[in-house]
Amino acid sequence: MAQYLCLNQEETKQLLDAYEIDTIGAFTFYRRKHIQTFFKEADHVLDQDHPMTEQFTYSEEVLIDDVYTGKINVEHILYTLYSHETREENPHVRIMEQPYEMSLILDSFNHLSSDMPITHLFCLDNSQKQTKNHEFYNLQCLNNLLPVILRNKNYHPYYYYSNVSIMNEHDVFYPNVMITTRYVFTYTNDHSQGILYKTPQIVNAFKEKFDAYIKEASCFMTRESWVDNLTDIQTFFNTQTITRELMTTPCPTYVFEESDLAIMRKSLKDFFPDKEGFIKQFHDFANYWNQEFYTRYSDLFHIIYTVQGLRYTAKTGYLHDIPPELFNPLSLEDRLLLITKWKEFCKKHPYIMMADMPYLSETSTTYFQLSDQVFHMIAADSTGTLANISIQEVTLVEAFNDFFENVIKKNAYSKEEEIKLIDECIEMIKKEM
């Protein structure tokens, strides 16, 4: 039809988009677009270093009960309250504000302390109404809060549902609140005005009401630090029902045998922390994977990797599993062995699928794992420790499941095409040898 109508590339795209919107609905169409953007930007959020401020000047400002006007003054009070709270014996900050507006403030807080217990209550949308920018509001909240939970292991977000689009259309009387040990600060959505209270009875009343709300709310996401990387991953597989895993490059853990451990040993840089301990973990996990886990769950556990990641490993020798700062690239001989074994692994298992996902960086060291109830992102935090971030909110889990199904339907290669592309990489390596 596009050829018949003499449409250019952009007009053809608009026609195809209009057809898809008519087929699946605008909400699902734009939701998939936003999730694609999420994967494109995920490594920027998850893999970036989060430097902490070594020293800062604690505010000695004496706060008084008053009305504060102007965004600069309101945000100065928020920052000062947090600064004061860091010096309390049992610090705890309670916040009720939408992540859409609050993320920059939370991020700046963590320059003062990455250990501050923060309980954050906010509202998510359950309306499926499109905003004027076709935004997926709940995903935007996730984007804003990921850097916070990566930096602060004591950050605990909770949510309740309401129609956010209706809420945003009406002015609400001082809807936001920050509660510390000694103070309560209520303020407007635009941070133009706030009221500070420090009467103990008022502070305690706000704490009691906030804690009552938390009991009725649901956990948005959790963070679990994995210090013993592969051992913790094995425990994770034993306790979670994972149905899909998304990664970029071939994974040596799934195909290397005991005779291949020398490859990993020479590839890990000399300063790799507890190098021999990691090699032992690698060996133990490979045995667990091949002899226990995948023999039982190969029909349930679907692995998606990308053609971009395959080519990246073939060309560079780098892997998805280990950050390049800690890893010497595989030699041509070792690349050939890995990709040849990966080919046999893929031929044997129909649920190992290669997909074309150019928006997901081939250098990504982040794993994405999904079940029917939880979406997991496994990434390095600011200390280099693996952090398993688990999102449990229903609309987001549903959205990621839908996105993965669509990737498999539209962007996954057939098994014959997959093997052909792997063979091309094998031939490329052989020509360089």
Go through the PLM ranges and name each one.
Residues M1-N8, Y19, V177, D321-I322, ...:
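Aromatic-residue detector
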Residues F38-E75:
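The feature captures two recurrent sequence modes
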Residues Q3-T53:
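Short amphipathic recognition helices of helix-turn-helix/homeodomain-type DNA-binding modules
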Residues I64-E417, L421-C425, I429-K430:
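Hydrophobic protein-protein interaction segments
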Residues M1, L5-Q9, L15, Q201-F206, ...:
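Generic hydrophobic secondary-structure signal
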